[in-house]
């Protein structure tokens, strides 16, 4: 058996095409496009690529990203908080995202909590996370929302199924577990202290892997016919010195066991950016229409 490939890049392209039409219609109706401000502090090279992709994708669908800013690493926490306050008050800015990680002298928790919940398009403000816990509408974390959209578009049944999540971060593991619960899955969350991980993953009808460890999950850990969602993205170097991107799943072996699997790249990553754009449009509509 060879798994069906869940192509997140193709799905993201389709959703972004739909967003482009929606943004054009909204701009004609309200006289301005949705506005997104991505704040990047410092010179982390990985962050540079992520920020560039977010701004480029935003522009492509018609979102105004002119108020995105690259800030010096020496910027103080007080200065960053003051900037967020100004963006919170700016009626042309519908979404604010602070690119992580931040320099060590800045408390990321205080910074993320300063963003107005209605402009928190990364879905990390306590208010939005609380709404998720309560099952209420709100801006959802981008990567978990992307995972759920992939599962939905693929027609993967969740009600009554066993879903195992590897990882418990506030960025992915915890919110995706809550979203799976919302769809009536029986959810098991595992992490670095979990005993006999393989015994648990072999129970999964749906396995979501967000461990941050290259190729952690092998074919022996996967139940035949399971759906595997690989959230990880890691750059590794082989014995010849060649660099390549891999996920947290050993794709080549697991694809022979699973019913469906997301690749790395072209899997969850493109959907994360797309959900950011969708959240920005959602915030815009909530503020101007509702």
UniProtKB/Swiss-Prot annotation:
Database matches in InterPro entries: Aminoacid_DH-like_N_sf (IPR046346), NAD(P)-bd_dom_sf (IPR036291), THF_DH/CycHdrlase (IPR000672), THF_DH/CycHdrlase_cat_dom (IPR020630), THF_DH/CycHdrlase_CS (IPR020867), THF_DH/CycHdrlase_NAD-bd_dom (IPR020631)
Record Pfam families: THF_DHG_CYH (PF00763), THF_DHG_CYH_C (PF02882)
UniProt xrefs under SUPFAM superfamilies: Aminoacid dehydrogenase-like, N-terminal domain, NAD(P)-binding Rossmann-fold domains
Keyword Hydrolase among record annotations: yes
EC number in record: 1.5.1.5, 3.5.4.9
Catalytic activity: (6R)-5,10-methylene-5,6,7,8-tetrahydrofolate + NADP(+) = (6R)-5,10-methenyltetrahydrofolate + NADPH; (6R)-5,10-methenyltetrahydrofolate + H2O = (6R)-10-formyltetrahydrofolate + H(+)
Pathway: One-carbon metabolism; tetrahydrofolate interconversion
GO molecular function, one term: methenyltetrahydrofolate cyclohydrolase activity
Annotated residues for binding of NADP(+): 167-169, 192, 233
GO biological process entries: L-histidine biosynthetic process; methionine biosynthetic process; purine nucleotide biosynthetic process; tetrahydrofolate interconversion
Summary of subunit composition and partner proteins: Homodimer.
Similarity remark: Belongs to the tetrahydrofolate dehydrogenase/cyclohydrolase family.
Name of the protein in question: Bifunctional protein FolD
Species for this entry: Gloeobacter violaceus (strain ATCC 29082 / PCC 7421)
Classification lineage: Bacteria, Bacillati, Cyanobacteriota, Cyanophyceae, Gloeobacterales
Gene this chain is encoded by: folD
